[in-house]
Curated annotation (Swiss-Prot):
It comes from Mus musculus. Binds to the receptor tyrosine kinases EPHA2, EPHA3 and EPHB1. Forms a ternary EFNA5-EPHA3-ADAM10 complex mediating EFNA5 extracellular domain shedding by ADAM10 which regulates the EFNA5-EPHA3 complex internalization and function. Binds to EPHB2. Interacts with EPHA8; activates EPHA8. This is Ephrin-A5. Residues 1-20 form the signal peptide. Cell surface GPI-bound ligand for Eph receptors, a family of receptor tyrosine kinases which are crucial for migration, repulsion and adhesion during neuronal, vascular and epithelial development. Binds promiscuously Eph receptors residing on adjacent cells, leading to contact-dependent bidirectional signaling into neighboring cells. The signaling pathway downstream of the receptor is referred to as forward signaling while the signaling pathway downstream of the ephrin ligand is referred to as reverse signaling. It is a lipid-anchor; GPI-anchor. Disulfide bonds join C62-C102, C90-C151.
Length: 228
């Protein structure tokens, strides 16, 4: 019975060590809704950008049409995450990777929605990790039948942690294109433009580390367990 109690205590200490290490954690997460279509006025201006905090969400809604709209009148997009150069030139071929595909304009369940969580760490080898104080870029391009190339692009700035203090709440806050909320924090001159690459090799370097004091307690409890 004593072994079970010690194992339970050991598990609780380990759980505290791991889950107390996320400096970007917060109680309330904001969700930013972006309607990805050419009729969105914020895309038409060419300067669409949002400011987010770690653990916020980006919800991308694809174009959706009634069944009566012909296929050749619908919009379809492939969305890419790119670096700053790819964003400026609206070119994903040199340094970018495919993120989502809006390919079901007549979906019976409504518009396709894709969500991005701006998290510091991801358990997936091809997932993307975000850093406070850096900019990230999304683009899409479509070539209509008339050959005219169109480009929609979005810039996302992840705010520094000290500017993301949240009050306690029950529900996520949702912002969409019609909200009259101006971004109060513009990127500083020294803002880092993040490279558009998944976090394959960075996971090992960025994995949360257990503090030395808690590690000592953990080893002490393990030693006690082994002597029983």
């Amino acid at each position: 019975m004593l072994h079970v109690e010690m194992l339970t205590l050991l598990f609780l200490v380990l759980w505290m060590c791991v889950f107390s290490q996320d400096p970007g954690s917060k109680v309330v997460a904001d969700r930013y809704a972006v309607y990805w279509n050419s009729s969105n006025p914020r895309f038409q201006r060419g300067d669409y950008h949002i400011d987010v905090c770690i653990n916020d969400y980006l919800d991308v809604f694809c174009p959706h049409y009634e069944d009566s709209v012909p296929e050749d009148k619908t919009e379809r997009y492939v969305l890419y995450m790119v670096n700053f150069d790819g964003y400026s030139a609206c070119d994903h071929t040199s340094k970018g990777f495919k993120r989502w595909e809006c390919n079901r304009p007549h979906s019976p369940n409504g518009p396709l929605k894709f969500s991005e969580k701006f998290q510091l760490f991801t358990p997936f080898s091809l997932g993307f990790e975000f850093r406070p104080g850096r900019e990230y870029f999304y683009i899409s391009s479509a070539i209509p039948d008339n050959g005219r190339r169109s480009c929609l692009k979005l810039k996302v700035f992840v705010r520094p942690t000290n500017s993301c203090m949240k009050t306690i709440g029950v529900h996520d806050r949702v912002f969409d294109v019609n909200d009259k909320v101006e971004n109060s924090l513009e990127p500083a001159d020294d803002t880092v433009h993040e490279s558009a690459e998944p976090s394959r090799g960075e996971n090992a370097a960025q994995t949360p580390r257990i503090p030395s004091r808690l590690l000592a307690i953990l080893l002490f409890l393990l030693a006690m367990l082994l002597t029983l």
